Amino acid sequence: MEKLAGYVEHIIYRNTDNGYTVLNLVSGEDEITCVGIFSTIAEGENIEATGDYTDHPTYGTQFKVVSFEEKAPEDQEAIERYLGSGAIKGIGLAMAARIVRRFKEDTFRIIEEEPERLVEVKGISERKAMEIASQVNEKRDLRQAMIFLQQFGITMNLAVKIYNKYGQEVYGILKENPYRLADDIEGVGFRTADDIAAKAGIRTDSDFRVRSGILYTLLQASGEGHTFLPQEELTAKTSELLGIDKDIIEKNYMDLSIDRKIIMKQSGEQTQIYSASFYYMEANTATMLRELDIAYDVADAEIEQRINNIEKQTGMQLDEHQVQAVKEAVRNGLLVITGGPGTGKTTTINTIIRYFEMEGMDIFLAAPTGRAAKRMSETTGFEARTIHRMLELNGGMEGSAGFERNETNPLETDLVIIDEMSMVDITLMNSLLKAIAPGTRLILVGDINQLPSVGPGSVLKDIIQSEALNVVMLTKIFRQASTSDIIVNAHKINRGEEVSLDNKSMDFFFLKRYEADIIINVVLQLVKQKLPKFVDATPYDIQVLTPMRKGLLGVERLNGILQQYLNPPDKSKREKEHGDMVFREGDKVMQTKNNYQLEWEIRTKFGLTVDKGMGIFNGDMGIITEINDFAETMTVEFDEGRKVEYSYKLLDELELAYAITIHKSQGSEYPAVVIPLLSGPSMLMNRNLLYTAVTRARKCVTLVGNDATFNQMIQNTSQQKRYSGLCDRIRESVL
């Protein structure tokens, strides 16, 4: 690597989020364009940079900086240039010249040690002298803090965040308890804090480390869908994480409990340990559900007469279970309606909507995802929104949702109907219930046999299994649905019955292939050539669903192959390498985590903004429309024309989406799905997963692979255990 010393003449571009900067550096007689992370550098400052020269295809020769060191200006010319650069507010070129003319090379010592002497310069009052000294000292303190933090391997961008949070306290915090960073600083997790702690010499059995490790293990468990862990399991996992004895971990539970960081709940012989936030979410959710469960006295004859009128007006014909669902909706403030595909959930919802519309009630419809909300709108004829949009997402704190609608500003409506409830996790459910005022009716609709939510909890399943709230199960498959082999076979799968694979169907096919590469070739032909014509859709509308991320038929490998086949490299398409992936303009991508602070806009073809909002969520899919290397941004257009500009630092939140996991497809519906099946772990390759995959298709399901694996999945009812206590909390709230 080469070294380059000089002064910063001009900052061309700076990304304030990550500190990435393009600047002109004057080194001797040369002016060089430098690129790198320079969060704290200002024009006029002297630096010594380490890096390499590179040739950018658009911007020419650049010096790519890996590290740099700020140098205090030493001669009068350098001092004057720095002071007059604008780095110190209140000092212009003329003032800088007067200061340096008076104090010469001693200028910085005077400012730092004898600032009162600055009044000797014309135009500087005592107050201004102190302001100048304060700014110079702040910059000196920041520079020293950066040097201190970087010895722990902390990046410049993160170092600035840490210093902005703690200021001069940073020295004590890093030497005594670096694990505070994991609690206080966005982007610092336990592992980062643990690395810093190791370099700071913190003992491996330090109470700070053990307690942070326990909380981190619970956080990891929530990412796997759990709201708590049994004590024995939590102890074992934390012991493995930290590499210390279980006894040391057990000793720290009481202190964490006293500090209300964890809640320890006894359930029979099992001790359940929650992060406090998840326990209170479950407890509050249970309480709020019970408060909404109000009984209304309405005569059977009155309800039946209204249903008959609706049937005559719409031509709909309800069966006894659907009629019962409407009656329960009228008589109760809270109702759950569950059933598989083709069992009449949509007809039931439509009847309920029209019933309460006749009563003059205001009705809100919502679903967890944009795709599910759009489908709800299409099937009901009424506007439906995402739950986040209904609750008026405002971005909240970093990493968490904040909603305008809550207990102090509830939704102004008489009835809320939520579809695809199997996707709703405990966090979103808690926020939803806070926004529903007492006396507002709530109807929850979903299929209990779908996969559970990606986020923590088993909300729909727990509500139904509590047997404490009103639930109607729809089981009859209606005649029009019974002609669809997708629906018929989905119910057979759910009942564990044999499914015919003779390919005599018009919408359900199984192509038997037994080698991964052959399966992939068939998938490619289906997606690009055969299915688009068959279902009248584009190749991008055909969704490949696979059980796993890794492996020969995993998401990662399939996406690379499908990208080359559907969106190959082209001189007209810009690309961005990111880790093992290449993003290309025209690629189909998916958001992989909830980001409540991402801003989106919907614009006309003339560039006028017609709508805007915040929040892009796990599973949202879109198309890359622009990659801009200079601005370090990538623009993605999601459903409904929502455009989002991603800075390069956020690209970890995106992945290619030609193929996605079955779990990620939950709540979505596609014209056709292709499901490659070969083999996999029995805990994953189960009936529940297969049922979810098959029910994602509207017009056609095509499975490609091993028929033995398909039949084994139908018979395999094993599932990974998900620890959730909402069922118990609901039962407790009844007592």
Predicted regions and their residues:
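The Walker A (P-loop) glycine that initiates the GxxxxGKT/S ATP-binding motif of P-loop NTPases
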Residues: A87, E120, G339, A367, ...
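C-terminal accessory regions
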Residues: V610-D611, N618-L735
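Conserved helicase motor core of P-loop NTPases
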Residues: I448-M614
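Pre-Walker A segment
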Residues: Q266-G340, T347
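Conserved RecA-like ASCE P-loop NTPase motor core of nucleic-acid helicases/translocases
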Residues: L335-S377, V445, F508-E515, K530-G551
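Loop/turn positions that initiate beta-strands
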Residues: G44-N46, G586, G619
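Conserved helicase motor core of SF1/SF2 NTP-dependent helicases
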Residues: T351, Y355, E359-M361, G370-S377, ...
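Accessory, non-ATPase domains that flank or precede helicase/AAA+ motor cores in DNA-metabolism machines
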Residues: M1-E302
